[in-house]
From Swiss-Prot:
Entry membrane topology: Multi-pass membrane protein
Assembly, per entry: NDH-1 is composed of 14 different subunits. Subunits NuoA, H, J, K, L, M, N constitute the membrane sector of the complex.
Species the sequence originates in: Acinetobacter baylyi (strain ATCC 33305 / BD413 / ADP1)
Any one annotated GO CC term: NADH dehydrogenase complex
MF terms (GO), sorted A to Z: NADH dehydrogenase (ubiquinone) activity; NADH:ubiquinone reductase (non-electrogenic) activity; quinone binding
Regions of compositional bias (Polar residues) in chain numbering: 164-183
Catalyses which reaction(s): a quinone + NADH + 5 H(+)(in) = a quinol + NAD(+) + 4 H(+)(out)
Name the record gives this protein: NADH-quinone oxidoreductase subunit A
Transmembrane segments: 11-31, 63-83, 98-118
Keyword Chloroplast applies: no
Region listing for Disordered, in residue ranges: 160-183
Keywords in alphabetical order: Cell inner membrane, Cell membrane, Membrane, NAD, Quinone, Translocase, Transmembrane, Transmembrane helix, Transport, Ubiquinone
Cross-referenced Gene3D superfamilies: NADH:ubiquinone/plastoquinone oxidoreductase, chain 3
Main location: membrane
Length: 183
């Protein structure tokens, strides 16, 4: 069994310090913080704005597919950058490997465009393929399911009021500003 080195003491001190910091941050708010309960405390809020409407707002899912493709092709760009910084060290073998990699990327990109994965709505893909929906079958058009008519659906609650930004009061959607008449 070897003696404890200064490096071991540093690790032990670090673990003790982190543990103390975690316990401190969890217990001090319990001791010093006020405890109040009520209906307003149970309400969800986003950045201090009073919520409006229900939680069942349909948001467009079109961007998720593009985001996934962005992440995939962004990672490939990272690999290309790593190869470009070490191109002299890897030689012809690395060059050949990267050419195969780039060709695979181009094939994947052509496949993505050919399958219509970047087309915004499935109905456009069905029209391009010449597929007509069957009468009586459920319409599974994801673009129609996730579409919302306007931004007003997001900011107007069911009673037709627009929530105030920070006060919690509700302002009428149709309220007009006082006008001054000149005679």
């Amino acid at each position: 069994m070897s003696a404890i080195t200064p490096y071991d003491w540093a690790i032990i001190a670090f673990v003790i310090g982190v543990t103390f910091l975690c316990v401190f941050m969890l217990t001090v708010p319990l001791l010093l913080g006020g405890k109040s309960w009520g209906r307003a405390k149970q309400e969800q809020f986003e950045s201090g704005v009073v919520s409006a409407g229900g939680a069942r707002i349909r948001l467009s899912a079109k961007f998720y597919l593009v985001a996934i493709f962005f992440v995939v092709f962004d990672l490939e760009a990272l690999y290309l950058y790593a190869w470009a910084t070490s191109v002299r060290e890897v030689g012809w073998m690395g060059f050949t490997t990267m050419v195969i990699f780039v060709v695979d990327l181009l094939i994947a990109l052509i496949y993505v465009f050919a399958t219509g994965a970047l087309t915004w709505s499935p109905s456009d893909r069905r029209k391009a393929a010449g597929i007509k929906p069957k009468i009586g079958s459920p319409n599974m058009n994801i673009a129609e399911i996730t579409r919302f008519n306007s931004i007003e659906e997001l900011v107007i609650d069911p009673t037709g009021h627009i929530p105030a930004q920070s006060s919690g009061r509700m302002k009428s959607k149709t309220s007009t500003a006082p006008s001054s008449k000149q005679e």
